[in-house]
Amino acid sequence: MKYVIMLAIVVGLAIADFVTGIIKAAINRDISSQKMRIGGLHKIMELLVMTTACGLEIGIRELGKYYQAPQLAEIAGAFAAGAVFAYILSMEIISILENYVEANPEAKWAAGIVKKLRVFQQQKEKEEHNDSADQQSGEG
């Protein structure tokens, strides 16, 4: 049952993100069928990734029973599905907030949240880029 709930939440947030994106585009007079098609395909991929993570959790749990390590397998599987779920959940909520801010620039509370999240994201990307550059320079 928890998988159905997780998938329902992901589907609900994906639909909300898609709809807020359409509303934002309509308000900004920037409706594009290509963007809608690509956005819809991204949402389908998110659902497939979440479904795969749920299947992975089930598979790892069953494999743990076979190898006499059910608790360890259950923790590993739950972590995998939970991590994917948390990532998709946060990504969708951030996207919905971004759509809201772009459609309604007067929403200062949401704009502040989005601004902080963008700074955090840029710092993380910069750190990842630096780590990648360090690894490449160490290999040469």
Kindly give the residue locations of the regions a language model identified.
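Alpha-helical transmembrane segments and their lipid-water interface positions
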Residues: 20-24, 50, 98-102
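N-terminal signal-anchor/start-transfer transmembrane helix
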Residues: 8-26
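Transmembrane helix-loop junctions in multipass membrane proteins, especially transporters and channels
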Residues: 25-33, 58, 62, 66, ...
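Alpha-helical transmembrane segments of integral membrane proteins
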Residues: 4-7, 44-45, 77-88, 94, ...
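Mid-chain, well-packed structural core segment of small domains
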Residues: 55-91
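Membrane-proximal cytosolic segments adjacent to transmembrane helices
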Residues: 90-140
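A generic, lipid-embedded transmembrane alpha helix
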Residues: 42-61
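Juxtamembrane helix-capping/reentrant segments at transmembrane boundaries
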Residues: 32-46
